[in-house]
């Protein structure tokens, strides 16, 4: 029943990967990943944070109660729809971005998972489900059908996408949002059709490798991925999950906070940055190997010489 939302990748987007499906570009909201569905066997709505099922006492800042109130007057069609799908979205509570007061404590649906097929549904069906359930959604900035991706100028498409990063009508100061999400218009296999995010510098979870001043290989590789943005992301998750409280965020509680976030911080880097880390290791090896090989071969030349 529980389905954890698949990671949105922060690198590797290639427009050519979507020429058969098309793409959509939507606002990425700075809230808590959450979901809900209807369990027909148990005859109840089940509500989840990113990592666990929620209850009255573990509610993700009121999301559990919000959903129960939201669905209490659902008709038969809406219940049947919710039985087939898990609805994913963002529960908007205060994190880093400052939104208008009226935007908070609302759920913005951004994806629909078909529980029978194990796939995320198409853009068209997703909008139908959202309409049936009367759900709010993040702003959709643009869509490109497959034929448009083939016909339109690639650089203009990419330029238009980049211009959307940070746009928001919900932020207190206009257009100071977190970023955008790019995903396929078609049915999506969680294992083979990832979504991508582009965020503003404020939310970038890595530092440019060229900006680093490494004192050694390990420091260089670790430092590029250890950022305040990534740390804040993990801390906010722990607050949402009630592992930490606002009162815990004090220097006198350093040990508790460190113990709560360290493993998730490490796992997040390993999951999101492993490809880049391996790439940098290979690059480093490629640079250092000649320094070993050259003197070795020079020595062999001397051994074979007459003098």
Residue ranges and their predicted role:
Residues 1-307:
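Core nucleotide-handling region used for phosphoryl-transfer chemistry
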């Amino acid at each position: 029943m529980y389905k954890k939302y698949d990671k949105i990748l922060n690198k590797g987007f290639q427009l050519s990967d979507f020429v058969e499906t098309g793409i959509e570009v939507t606002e990425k909201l700075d809230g808590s990943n959450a979901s809900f569905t209807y369990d027909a066997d148990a005859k109840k709505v089940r509500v989840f944070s990113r990592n666990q099922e929620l209850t009255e006492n573990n509610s993700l800042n009121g999301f559990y109660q919000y959903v129960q109130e939201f669905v209490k007057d659902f008709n038969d069609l809406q219940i049947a729809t919710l039985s087939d799908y898990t609805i994913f979205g963002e529960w908007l509570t205060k994190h880093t971005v400052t939104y208008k007061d009226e935007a908070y404590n609302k759920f913005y649906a951004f994806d629909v998972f078909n529980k029978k097929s194990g796939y995320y549904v198409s853009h068209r069906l997703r909008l139908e489900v959202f309409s049936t359930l009367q759900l709010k959604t993040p702003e959709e900035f643009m869509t490109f059908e497959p034929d448009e991706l083939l016909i339109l100028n690639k650089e203009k498409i990419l330029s238009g996408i980049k211009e959307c990063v940070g746009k928001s009508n919900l932020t207190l100061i206009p257009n100071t949002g977190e970023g955008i999400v790019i995903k396929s218009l078609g049915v999506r296999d969680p294992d083979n059709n990832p979504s991508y995010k582009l965020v503003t510098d404020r939310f970038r979870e890595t530092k440019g490798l060229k900006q680093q001043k490494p004192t050694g290989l390990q420091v260089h590789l670790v430092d590029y991925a250890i950022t305040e943005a990534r740390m804040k992301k993990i801390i906010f998750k722990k607050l949402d999950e009630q592992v930490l409280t606002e009162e815990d965020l004090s220097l006198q509680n350093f040990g508790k906070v460190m113990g709560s976030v360290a493993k998730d911080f490490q796992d997040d880097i390993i999951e999101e940055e492993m490809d880049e880390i391996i790439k940098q290791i290979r690059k480093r090896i490629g640079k250092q190997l000649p320094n070993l090989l050259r003197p070795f071969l020079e020595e062999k030349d001397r051994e074979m010489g007459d003098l």
